[in-house]
From Swiss-Prot:
Protein name: Ribosomal RNA large subunit methyltransferase H
Similarity field: Belongs to the RNA methyltransferase RlmH family.
Pfam family, one: SPOUT_MTase
Record-listed E.C. numbers: 2.1.1.177
Catalytic reaction list: pseudouridine(1915) in 23S rRNA + S-adenosyl-L-methionine = N(3)-methylpseudouridine(1915) in 23S rRNA + S-adenosyl-L-homocysteine + H(+)
Lineage: Bacteria, Bacillati, Bacillota, Clostridia, Eubacteriales
Subcellular location: Cytoplasm
One Gene Ontology MF term: rRNA (pseudouridine-N3-)-methyltransferase activity
Function statement: Specifically methylates the pseudouridine at position 1915 (m3Psi1915) in 23S rRNA.
Gene Ontology cellular-component annotations: cytoplasm
First-tier enzyme category under EC: transferase
UniProtKB keywords: Cytoplasm, Methyltransferase, rRNA processing, S-adenosyl-L-methionine, Transferase
């Protein structure tokens, strides 16, 4: 299985970078996982809704260019309006994708303002991490941990409780 996290902006905090690297290492026996980062767009102070929409559009264009243009990836966008999966449901989702030959996944994480409608339209699946709001830079770490947990669940290995 090949999994890509396609995200806007780099993780800047060292403790989060360390966590991301740890889970990338833990995932190596289960899947090829990579993180593709596109630059974030500066948000002007006191940005108007139109300026915010323009920021999301520019970031969205970058995200779409980073996705597999051949349609070989199942695109999963993270959005607060998406489906809430339990860890077991995420494990079942990954297993189902692999079973049906859809083993290339791209999880798309938008910028701090969210995702442009064009990116949302590209989604095969829309996933929510829940109703809480997370620091944007934490999302890759949280997602990687959940993907790791899902692989452990699917293999019946000790980790998930």
């Amino acid at each position: 299985m090949r999994i890509r996290l396609v995200t806007v902006g780099k993780v800047k905090e060292k403790y989060l970078q360390d966590g991301v690297q740890e889970y990338l290492k833990r995932l190596r026996p289960y899947a090829r996982v990579e993180i593709v980062t596109v630059p974030d767009e500066p948000i002007p102070d006191g940005a108007s809704p139109a300026q915010e929409a323009q920021v999301m559009q520019r970031e969205g264009e970058r995200l779409l260019r980073a996705l597999d243009q051949g349609g070989q990836e199942h695109v999963v966008v993270l959005d607060g309006r998406g489906k809430n999966f339990s860890s077991e449901e995420l494990a079942a989702f990954l297993a189902e994708r692999a079973l049906h030959g859809d083993a290339n996944l791209a999880f798309v994480i938008g910028g701090s303002l969210g995702l442009d409608p064009a990116v949302l339209a590209r989604a095969g699946t829309t996933l929510s991490l829940g109703r809480m709001t997370f620091l944007h830079q934490m999302v890759p770490l949280i997602l990687l941990e959940q993907i790791y947990r899902a692989f452990k669940i699917n293999r019946g290995e000790k980790y998930h409780k």
